[in-house]
Design a protein with these regions (language model features):
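Conserved Rossmann-fold dehydrogenase catalytic segment
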Residues: 144, 172-181, 203-226, 243-252, ...
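A glycine-rich dinucleotide-binding beta-alpha-beta segment and adjacent secondary-structure elements
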Residues: 401-455
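Long, intrinsically disordered low-complexity tandem-repeat segments
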Residues: 270-333
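Short Gly/Pro-enriched turn/cap motifs at secondary-structure boundaries
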Residues: 67, 75, 247-252, 258-259, ...
Length: 506
């Protein structure tokens, strides 16, 4: 497996010199900051104080899902390349520290509920007055304005409001969520785009009146980031009154493009030797994977006058029924599927030839997508009959030879064993402080001259508190006093003149 040595501080990234304050927690804000840090930004993560040895305080994500040595392994992905400053933002002394850090920062990222920053006396407009070049990224469920601004918002709720949840289901069944936090991640990536745009504007706005350029506030709403990816949903409704409904594994309006069951069954075991496996045991104290808290109550009510699920743009495209030629599966086993995208006109003909149905490929009524959509059930059934007689590997080999886009539905075991993932550096091996090795996703995107790099492992809570505060001019005695009063944490007895405790500016 390809590995990325960790850490490697000698290579400067494209964002080297960019100073970022991250005041977020959980996913959206921290993911945005992590993306900037991967490409060289100097990121200080501010999180609630506590006792790192006892596992108290800090970003709640430190305790999410499976834990190793008391800390989530997800933490090693979400907080790599960052520094940790443990600070109680409710305290006036902590708020003053944030103002001092903001005065020397380029970017501040926060994802609290609207009004929280203002309640701490840290309103973005006031911070920008102190530092006119400061860029503030604000991520929230519903945005900083509008009638819903004060509602609490998780990514899962944003996915529902943004239109995604309605589409992720089998026709006529309960909508299901995507298996990861797409709403948060999409908002984070939109936020990163906003930061880069604001940096470009700051550079372009340099003038005698603004010698360092002008900063600004970026307002990202989780639901809007989801809605921005909803393709033609709104114009179809505007032009035709069409409400797209769930289509299961099919791609609505495109044929054929679906998941088809094969002869073999799905396994969670690696497909080949050399896959990435955990070298250390998972904490038994962690219990089952810790799920994200679900919104209270049942289904979200629709506004009065909203269009019901019965409205539809044409006939629903059903997922193909199990084919007659498949072998019976063992009780509790899961069938293995392949995704086949034969929706190009010439691709469709090659696909039909490969599955032994050249008659469908030669049918003039199926020569284009519009005709195929009308008969999608017939086409899916023909493909499903063929895939059910073969294993996934046989199907993929045949379609690859025919030039038909297709792929297996990967489990993480498949990913960990896949040579393409390995060749692209997407299976990074991180050496932990205890000497163990942890596999984490590599960095994207891939830049030819200035690629991202894993420079630092994720910090322990307050690991950099002393050094950061020394950089602001505080003495070791003053810093210890802040810790004694519960305002900061992470300060350990050390020689103040040592490299690890000597101050460094933001």
């Amino acid at each position: 497996m390809t590995s990325m040595p960790t850490p490697q501080p000698q290579r400067a990234g494209p964002l080297s010199g960019l100073k970022v304050l991250e005041m977020g927690q959980l996913i959206a804000g921290p993911f945005a900051a992590k993306t900037l840090a991967d490409f060289g930004a100097h990121v200080i993560k501010i999180e609630p104080p506590g006792d790192a040895d006892l596992g108290t305080g800090g970003d709640p994500l430190r305790k999410w899902r499976l834990l190793k040595d008391g800390t989530s392994v997800w933490w090693q992905v979400q907080s790599r390349n960052k520094r940790s400053l443990a600070l109680d933002l409710r305290r006036a002394e902590a708020q003053d520290i944030v103002r001092q850090l903001s005065a020397g920062a380029d970017v501040l990222i926060e994802n609290f509920r609207p009004g929280a920053m203002e309640g701490w006396g840290l309103a973005p407009d006031d911070l920008i007055k102190l530092n006119p070049r400061l860029i503030v990224l604000r991520i929230s469920g519903y945005g900083q304005t509008g009638p819903y601004r004060d509602r609490p918002g998780f990514g899962v709720v944003a996915e529902a409001m943004g239109g995604l949840r309605h589409l992720t289901a089998e026709p006529g069944h309960v909508p299901v969520r995507v298996g990861v936090s797409m709403g948060d991640t999409l908002a984070a990536l939109h936020g990163v785009i906003g930061v880069l745009l604001a940096l470009q504007h700051r550079h372009a706005s340099v003038s005698p009146e603004a010698p360092q350029g002008r900063g600004q506030v970026i307002d990202v709403a989780l639901y809007e980031a989801v809605f921005n990816c909803m393709e033609s949903l709104l114009p179809e409704y505007s032009a035709f009154g069409a409400v797209r409904n769930a289509a299961g594994s099919a791609l609505p309006g495109i044929a054929p493009s679906n998941a088809y069951r094969c002869r073999d069954t799905l396994t969670s075991e690696p497909r080949a030797a050399g896959s990435v496996r955990a070298a250390a045991s998972v904490d038994s104290s962690a219990g089952p994977p810790q799920a994200r808290p679900a919104p209270s109550g049942g289904s979200e009510p629709r506004a009065a006058g909203s269009v019901g699920a019965a409205a539809s743009a044409g006939p629903p495209q059903a997922r193909p029924a199990p084919s007659g030629g498949s072998e019976p599966r063992a009780a509790g086993s899961v069938g293995a599927y392949v995704l086949i995208a034969g929706n190009g006109d010439s691709i469709f003909k090659r696909l039909m030839k490969e599955i032994g149905r050249p008659d469908l490929g030669a049918d003039p009524a199926l020569a284009d997508n519009a005709g195929r959509v009308v008969r999608v059930g017939e086409i899916d059934h023909a493909i499903g009959q063929w895939t059910a007689q073969h294993t996934v590997e046989q199907v993929l080999a045949a379609l690859d030879g025919a030039g038909v886009p297709a792929g297996r539905i990967y489990t993480v075991a498949d990913i960990a064993a896949d040579p393409h993932y390995q060749a692209r550096g997407m299976l990074d091996q991180v050496q932990m402080d205890d000497g163990s090795v942890l596999a984490v996703p590599g960095i994207v995107p891939k830049l030819s001259l200035t690629p991202g790099l894993h420079r630092r492992n994720a910090p322990t809570l307050g690991q950099d508190t002393h050094k950061i505060l020394r950089g602001l001019g505080l003495t070791s005695e003053q810093i210890q006093g802040l810790q004694d009063n519960g305002i900061v944490s992470g300060v350990r007895a050390a020689n103040p003149a040592s490299p690890e405790t000597e101050g460094a500016p933001l």
